[in-house]
């Protein structure tokens, strides 16, 4: 489980770096590792979706394993711990889905509509929509990283309580 969680953290850091590079490529129009903005952004969005899916899978898989252990214990403490697991899921899954929707929507709006329908001369006409959407997406993504970190900590605390038998 710890190796799985560490791989989630590594992917989240790699994902944040990719998104930062992609945004800066769009603003300053430079190539990175021989790829243009569209090519690198496609890579970044694939890493983003993979990372968010991996984090969701972590909480689903560990939650299922914890449920099996707690069901065997059948105590009031086990019920309380299961309620904490459900609270974590209610906390993290909506944040992940909102982040996926915002970043994915930004990607589709930018590359699917703006780039395909404009030239470099008139791309600024969409900045009134693009920039607020970009800011909201970045803020939401950073907020979801905090929520994920807190959720990982809570999940580990629950596993520690189960391991210690309390």
What positions do the PLM features span?
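Alpha-helical transmembrane segments of integral membrane proteins, especially early/N-terminal helices
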Residues: 1-27, 98-99, 158-165
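Alpha-helical transmembrane segments and their immediate juxtamembrane interface regions
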Residues: 2-5, 116-162
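Loop-to-transmembrane boundary segments
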Residues: 2-10, 80-107
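Hydrophobic alpha-helical transmembrane segments of polytopic
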Residues: 8-15, 41-44, 97-104, 130-133
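Hydrophobic alpha-helical membrane-embedded segments
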Residues: 16-20, 35-64, 135-144
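Alpha-helical transmembrane segments and their membrane-interface junctions
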Residues: 17-25, 95-120
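Membrane-interfacial hairpin junctions
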Residues: 27-38, 114-123
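Short membrane-interface loop/juxtamembrane segments of multi-pass integral membrane proteins
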Residues: 69-95, 158-166
């Amino acid at each position: 489980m710890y190796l799985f969680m560490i791989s989630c953290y590594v992917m989240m850091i790699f994902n944040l770096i990719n998104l930062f590079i992609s945004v800066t490529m769009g603003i300053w129009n430079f190539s990175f590792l021989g790829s243009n903005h569209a090519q690198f952004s496609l890579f970044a969005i694939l890493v983003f979706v993979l990372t968010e899916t991996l984090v969701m899978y972590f909480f689903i898989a560990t939650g299922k394993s914890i449920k099996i252990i707690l069901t065997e214990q059948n105590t009031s403490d086990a019920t309380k711990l299961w309620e904490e697991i459900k609270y974590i899921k209610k906390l993290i899954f909506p944040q992940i889905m909102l982040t996926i929707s915002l970043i994915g929507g930004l990607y589709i709006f930018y590359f699917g509509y703006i780039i395909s329908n404009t030239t470099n001369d008139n791309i600024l006409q969409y900045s009134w929509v693009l920039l607020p959407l970009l800011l909201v997406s970045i803020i939401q993504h950073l907020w979801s990283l905090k929520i994920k970190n807190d959720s990982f900590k809570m999940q580990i605390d629950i596993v520690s309580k189960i391991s210690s038998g309390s």
